[in-house]
A protein has these predicted regions:
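Acidic catalytic patch
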Residues: 46-50, 70-98
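Alpha-helix C-capping/helix-to-loop hinge sites
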Residues: 17, 35-39, 55-59, 75-80, ...
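Acidic, PIN/NYN-like endoribonuclease modules and their adjacent C-terminal/linker elements
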Residues: 1-6, 109-141
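General small-molecule cofactor/ligand-binding pocket signal
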Residues: 43, 82, 137
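Short, well-structured N-terminal submotif of metal-dependent ribonuclease cores
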Residues: 1-44, 59-67, 71
Length: 141
């Protein structure tokens, strides 16, 4: 049996799974997340959960009701959740400089590294790029 690949999920993939305005992306994201649930291989961070709540309740068309958004956050909090702290912030700022990234993208990458994952699902970074031992995969590419 192949070893499961633990995967860090960025906000845009989580949000796409719950955003009805783009059915193609929603289907792809839901399939990816379903597989991670089945394999118990998903990891997330407090940053992702916070951003999801803000996006879902403010940018979805129509916005997700706050109570439902809290339910989704609580559901994904069952996954391993990387807590963002000062050491992670500092490591991300160094990664930001080394790889010419936005601070927020560097913070996602550092959270993925801290969790020990080697795969990051995101549409914000270059598909196929590898940074700090983490392979970037855009499921919508």
């Amino acid at each position: 049996m192949p070893e499961r690949q633990v995967t860090f999920v960025d906000t845009n993939v989580l949000a796409s799974a719950h955003d009805r305005s783009e059915p193609r992306k929603q289907g792809i994201a839901q399939a990816m997340l379903d597989a991670l649930w089945r394999d118990r291989a998903g990891v997330i961070s407090t940053q992702v959960l916070q951003e999801f709540y803000v996006v879902a309740t403010g940018k979805f068309g129509p916005p997700m009701p706050r109570g439902r958004a809290r339910e989704v956050v609580a559901l994904y909090a069952e996954w391993p959740v990387v807590q963002i702290d000062l050491l992670l912030d500092l490591a991300a700022s160094e990664l930001e400089d080394r790889h010419t990234l936005s601070f927020w993208d560097a913070l996602i990458l550092e959270a993925a590294r801290r969790a020990g994952t080697t795969r990051l699902l995101t549409e914000d970074l270059e598909h196929g790029r590898r940074i700090g031992g983490v392979s970037i995969e855009n499921p919508f590419a």
